[in-house]
Amino acid sequence: MRARRFIAIVLAALVPAALSACGGSPHGLASKDPQAIVAAATRAIEHVRSVRVSGTVDEGSRRDEIRFDLRLLRGRGATGRVAEHGLAFRMVTLGDTAYVQGTPAFWLQFGGTNVAAQLHGRWLRAPADHGDFASFASLTRAGTLIAHLLQGHGALSKGTTSTIDGRRVIAVHDASRQGTLYVATSGPPYPIRLVNASSDGARIDFGGFDAPVRLRAPARSVSVFSLRG
Protein backbone atom coordinates (compact mmCIF):
# COMPACT_ATOMS: atom_id res chain seq x y z
CA MET A 1 0.00 0.00 0.00
CA ARG A 2 1.40 3.38 -1.00
CA ALA A 3 0.32 5.05 2.24
CA ARG A 4 2.23 2.48 4.26
CA ARG A 5 5.33 3.13 2.13
CA PHE A 6 5.13 6.83 3.05
CA ILE A 7 5.54 5.94 6.71
CA ALA A 8 8.36 3.46 6.16
CA ILE A 9 10.42 5.91 4.11
CA VAL A 10 9.99 8.80 6.51
CA LEU A 11 10.92 6.68 9.52
CA ALA A 12 13.87 5.10 7.70
CA ALA A 13 15.24 8.54 6.97
CA LEU A 14 15.31 9.31 10.68
CA VAL A 15 17.37 6.31 11.80
CA PRO A 16 21.05 7.28 11.31
CA ALA A 17 21.43 9.80 14.13
CA ALA A 18 20.11 10.82 17.51
CA LEU A 19 17.61 13.49 18.56
CA SER A 20 18.53 15.90 21.31
CA ALA A 21 16.46 18.44 23.20
CA CYS A 22 16.38 20.77 26.17
CA GLY A 23 18.34 20.63 29.41
CA GLY A 24 21.98 20.65 28.26
CA SER A 25 24.82 22.81 29.47
CA PRO A 26 25.10 26.12 27.59
CA HIS A 27 28.92 25.80 27.43
CA GLY A 28 31.39 23.16 26.33
CA LEU A 29 29.22 20.90 24.18
CA ALA A 30 31.45 21.30 21.13
CA SER A 31 34.48 20.12 23.12
CA LYS A 32 32.88 16.81 24.10
CA ASP A 33 33.34 13.58 22.21
CA PRO A 34 30.48 12.50 19.92
CA GLN A 35 29.32 9.76 22.26
CA ALA A 36 29.00 12.26 25.09
CA ILE A 37 27.06 14.64 22.86
CA VAL A 38 24.63 11.88 21.93
CA ALA A 39 24.33 10.71 25.56
CA ALA A 40 23.52 14.23 26.74
CA ALA A 41 21.03 14.62 23.92
CA THR A 42 19.34 11.34 24.78
CA ARG A 43 18.87 12.40 28.40
CA ALA A 44 17.63 15.84 27.42
CA ILE A 45 14.86 14.66 25.11
CA GLU A 46 13.03 13.14 28.05
CA HIS A 47 12.16 16.64 29.23
CA VAL A 48 10.99 18.37 26.07
CA ARG A 49 7.22 18.94 26.08
CA SER A 50 6.76 19.54 22.38
CA VAL A 51 8.76 19.60 19.18
CA ARG A 52 8.21 20.31 15.50
CA VAL A 53 9.77 17.90 12.99
CA SER A 54 9.61 18.93 9.33
CA GLY A 55 11.47 18.21 6.16
CA THR A 56 11.77 16.19 3.00
CA VAL A 57 12.75 12.69 1.95
CA ASP A 58 13.97 12.39 -1.63
CA GLU A 59 13.47 9.06 -3.39
CA GLY A 60 15.57 10.07 -6.37
CA SER A 61 13.60 12.84 -8.05
CA ARG A 62 11.58 15.88 -7.08
CA ARG A 63 8.53 14.09 -8.41
CA ASP A 64 8.88 11.50 -5.66
CA GLU A 65 9.91 13.90 -2.89
CA ILE A 66 8.03 13.29 0.35
CA ARG A 67 7.33 16.33 2.51
CA PHE A 68 6.23 16.20 6.12
CA ASP A 69 5.52 18.62 8.94
CA LEU A 70 4.74 17.18 12.37
CA ARG A 71 4.11 18.74 15.77
CA LEU A 72 4.44 16.38 18.70
CA LEU A 73 3.08 17.03 22.18
CA ARG A 74 4.38 14.62 24.77
CA GLY A 75 1.71 12.74 26.66
CA ARG A 76 -1.15 14.21 24.62
CA GLY A 77 -0.75 13.41 20.94
CA ALA A 78 0.31 15.16 17.77
CA THR A 79 -0.72 16.67 14.48
CA GLY A 80 0.91 16.82 11.09
CA ARG A 81 0.93 16.42 7.32
CA VAL A 82 2.66 14.10 4.87
CA ALA A 83 2.57 14.60 1.09
CA GLU A 84 4.05 13.13 -2.06
CA HIS A 85 3.11 14.26 -5.59
CA GLY A 86 -0.65 14.43 -5.32
CA LEU A 87 -1.04 11.98 -2.45
CA ALA A 88 -1.32 13.70 0.89
CA PHE A 89 -2.86 13.24 4.29
CA ARG A 90 -3.23 15.09 7.57
CA MET A 91 -2.99 13.32 10.90
CA VAL A 92 -4.12 14.01 14.44
CA THR A 93 -3.65 11.72 17.40
CA LEU A 94 -5.36 12.38 20.72
CA GLY A 95 -4.64 9.81 23.37
CA ASP A 96 -5.66 6.42 22.00
CA THR A 97 -7.55 7.79 18.99
CA ALA A 98 -6.07 8.59 15.59
CA TYR A 99 -7.61 10.67 12.80
CA VAL A 100 -6.55 10.83 9.16
CA GLN A 101 -7.85 13.11 6.41
CA GLY A 102 -6.56 12.40 2.92
CA THR A 103 -6.83 13.89 -0.52
CA PRO A 104 -9.18 12.09 -2.93
CA ALA A 105 -6.17 10.45 -4.58
CA PHE A 106 -4.92 9.27 -1.22
CA TRP A 107 -8.24 7.67 -0.30
CA LEU A 108 -8.37 5.94 -3.68
CA GLN A 109 -5.00 4.39 -2.91
CA PHE A 110 -5.99 3.64 0.68
CA GLY A 111 -9.35 1.99 0.15
CA GLY A 112 -10.66 2.28 -3.39
CA THR A 113 -13.57 4.15 -4.95
CA ASN A 114 -16.24 3.35 -2.34
CA VAL A 115 -14.06 4.36 0.59
CA ALA A 116 -12.96 7.54 -1.20
CA ALA A 117 -16.60 8.51 -1.72
CA GLN A 118 -17.51 7.92 1.93
CA LEU A 119 -14.55 9.94 3.19
CA HIS A 120 -14.79 12.90 0.83
CA GLY A 121 -14.28 15.98 3.01
CA ARG A 122 -14.22 13.89 6.18
CA TRP A 123 -11.74 12.47 8.65
CA LEU A 124 -11.32 8.76 9.24
CA ARG A 125 -11.26 7.86 12.94
CA ALA A 126 -9.88 4.71 14.54
CA PRO A 127 -8.08 3.38 17.60
CA ALA A 128 -4.46 4.43 17.24
CA ASP A 129 -3.30 0.81 17.25
CA HIS A 130 -5.77 -0.34 14.58
CA GLY A 131 -4.36 -1.67 11.30
CA ASP A 132 -2.72 0.97 9.14
CA PHE A 133 -3.52 3.60 11.74
CA ALA A 134 -0.70 2.16 13.83
CA SER A 135 1.66 3.21 11.03
CA PHE A 136 0.06 6.65 10.68
CA ALA A 137 0.12 7.23 14.42
CA SER A 138 3.77 6.21 14.69
CA LEU A 139 4.65 9.45 12.91
CA THR A 140 2.91 11.57 15.51
CA ARG A 141 3.90 9.77 18.70
CA ALA A 142 6.92 11.44 20.22
CA GLY A 143 8.14 8.30 21.96
CA THR A 144 7.95 6.16 18.83
CA LEU A 145 9.53 8.78 16.61
CA ILE A 146 12.36 9.36 19.06
CA ALA A 147 12.99 5.62 19.31
CA HIS A 148 13.51 5.50 15.55
CA LEU A 149 15.84 8.47 15.74
CA LEU A 150 17.95 6.83 18.43
CA GLN A 151 18.28 3.33 17.05
CA GLY A 152 20.78 1.81 14.70
CA HIS A 153 23.56 4.38 14.38
CA GLY A 154 27.09 3.04 13.99
CA ALA A 155 30.30 4.45 15.41
CA LEU A 156 30.04 8.20 15.77
CA SER A 157 32.52 10.90 14.83
CA LYS A 158 32.48 14.59 15.57
CA GLY A 159 32.48 17.11 12.76
CA THR A 160 33.10 20.82 12.71
CA THR A 161 31.11 23.70 14.09
CA SER A 162 29.07 25.86 11.74
CA THR A 163 26.02 28.11 11.72
CA ILE A 164 22.47 27.14 10.71
CA ASP A 165 19.74 29.76 10.76
CA GLY A 166 21.85 31.99 12.96
CA ARG A 167 22.66 29.30 15.55
CA ARG A 168 26.06 27.76 16.17
CA VAL A 169 25.95 23.99 15.85
CA ILE A 170 28.26 20.99 16.12
CA ALA A 171 28.00 18.12 13.64
CA VAL A 172 27.90 14.45 14.65
CA HIS A 173 28.33 11.87 11.88
CA ASP A 174 27.50 8.19 11.86
CA ALA A 175 30.15 5.64 10.85
CA SER A 176 29.23 5.56 7.18
CA ARG A 177 28.92 9.36 6.91
CA GLN A 178 25.42 8.76 5.62
CA GLY A 179 23.80 10.75 8.42
CA THR A 180 24.81 14.01 10.10
CA LEU A 181 23.05 15.58 13.04
CA TYR A 182 23.63 19.25 13.84
CA VAL A 183 23.18 20.16 17.51
CA ALA A 184 23.09 23.65 19.02
CA THR A 185 26.23 24.46 20.99
CA SER A 186 24.76 27.26 23.11
CA GLY A 187 21.70 27.06 25.29
CA PRO A 188 19.91 23.71 25.42
CA PRO A 189 21.48 21.19 23.01
CA TYR A 190 18.56 21.22 20.61
CA PRO A 191 18.83 19.35 17.32
CA ILE A 192 18.71 21.86 14.49
CA ARG A 193 19.00 19.70 11.39
CA LEU A 194 19.47 16.07 10.35
CA VAL A 195 20.81 15.31 6.87
CA ASN A 196 20.85 11.79 5.47
CA ALA A 197 22.83 11.26 2.27
CA SER A 198 21.70 7.68 1.64
CA SER A 199 19.59 6.58 -1.33
CA ASP A 200 16.54 7.96 0.50
CA GLY A 201 18.21 11.30 1.10
CA ALA A 202 16.57 13.49 3.70
CA ARG A 203 16.77 16.88 5.31
CA ILE A 204 14.91 17.14 8.58
CA ASP A 205 14.62 20.31 10.64
CA PHE A 206 13.76 20.48 14.32
CA GLY A 207 12.22 23.45 16.09
CA GLY A 208 9.36 24.73 18.17
CA PHE A 209 10.72 23.16 21.34
CA ASP A 210 8.22 23.50 24.19
CA ALA A 211 6.01 25.69 22.00
CA PRO A 212 2.24 25.37 22.44
CA VAL A 213 0.63 22.71 20.26
CA ARG A 214 -3.12 22.96 19.72
CA LEU A 215 -4.81 19.59 19.52
CA ARG A 216 -8.52 19.16 18.87
CA ALA A 217 -10.57 16.20 17.71
CA PRO A 218 -11.58 16.93 14.09
CA ALA A 219 -15.25 17.40 13.29
CA ARG A 220 -17.03 15.26 10.69
CA SER A 221 -15.07 12.11 11.44
CA VAL A 222 -16.12 8.64 10.29
CA SER A 223 -15.34 5.53 12.30
CA VAL A 224 -13.19 3.01 10.48
CA PHE A 225 -15.65 0.33 11.65
CA SER A 226 -18.54 1.97 9.79
CA LEU A 227 -16.85 2.04 6.39
CA ARG A 228 -18.49 0.05 3.65
CA GLY A 229 -16.01 -1.58 1.32
Model-derived regions: residue spans:
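Gly/Pro-enriched, hydrophobic low-complexity segments
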Residues: 160-222
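N-terminal leader/targeting segments and the immediate start of mature chains
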Residues: 2-5, 9-74, 162, 211-213, ...
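A short, charged
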Residues: 114-133, 209-229
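Short, basic/low-complexity N-terminal boundary segments at the transition from targeting/disordered tails
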Residues: 68-78, 134-158, 164
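N-terminal mature ectodomain segment of secretory-pathway/periplasmic proteins
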Residues: 38-106, 180, 196
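Acidic/charged, solvent-exposed loop-and-adjacent secondary-structure segments enriched in E/D, K/R, S/T
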Residues: 101-145
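Short solvent-exposed loop/turn micro-motifs enriched in small/polar/acidic residues
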Residues: 63, 82-85, 153-155, 165-167, ...
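A short, polar/proline- and glycine-enriched secondary-structure boundary/capping micro-motif
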Residues: 89-93, 110-113, 202-205, 226-229
